[in-house]
């Protein structure tokens, strides 16, 4: 059984915004609609998405590289390091992406580290409407180190 640890999210969240090309307009409209709420938080985004959000809203955005150029992996690393609290990722389920493995890895990391994740506008709307969005919150994160050690030992014995 894995142990859990508590990770505190402050009232001012670190929110990362990502959108595939066909969903960038949808995300920008969502950000504009929620601008009064989002201005109370710190925004991050992958390259092109961040540029569009910043230009379209005048909200400050810390930008990573473009998704296909490693931005999704940068975001995943920041999630694993506990530096990002919320993922808003409007992805296109009907359009194959050249960096699909990176997208899958990012979503896996978001689940593994138990960060709130919205992949469509309805979920993002519910998220920002939640009272938890505006208060500090402690999320539970499983400690997988024991399971990893057990796996590595079993692999060593199998050799």
What residues fall within each predicted segment?
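Short internal beta-strands
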Residues: 40-49, 53
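Short active-site oxyanion
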Residues: 15, 36-43, 112-115
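Mid-chain, well-packed structural core segment of small domains
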Residues: 72-112
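Short hydrophobic/aromatic-enriched beta-strand-loop microsegments
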Residues: 42-43, 59-70, 138-141
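Short, acidic/small-residue loops that bind anionic groups at enzyme active sites
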Residues: 106-127
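Short, glycine-/small-residue-rich phosphate/pyrophosphate-handling segment
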Residues: 122-155
């Amino acid at each position: 059984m894995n142990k859990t640890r508590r990770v505190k999210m402050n009232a001012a969240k670190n929110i990362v915004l990502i959108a595939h090309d066909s969903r960038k307009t949808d995300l920008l409209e969502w950000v504009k609609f929620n601008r009064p709420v989002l201005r109370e938080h710190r925004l991050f985004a992958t390259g092109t998405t961040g540029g569009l959000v910043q230009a379209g809203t005048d909200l400050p955005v810390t930008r990573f590289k473009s998704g296909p150029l490693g931005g999704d992996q940068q975001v995943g690393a920041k999630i694993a390091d506990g530096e990002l609290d919320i993922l808003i990722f409007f992805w296109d389920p009907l359009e194959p992406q050249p960096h699909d493995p990176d997208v899958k890895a990012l979503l896996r990391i978001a689940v593994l580290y138990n960060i709130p994740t919205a992949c469509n506008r309805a979920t993002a709307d519910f998220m920002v409407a939640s009272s938890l969005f505006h208060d500090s919150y402690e999320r539970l994160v499983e400690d997988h180190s024991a399971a990893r050690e057990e796996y590595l030992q079993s692999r060593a014995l199998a050799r």
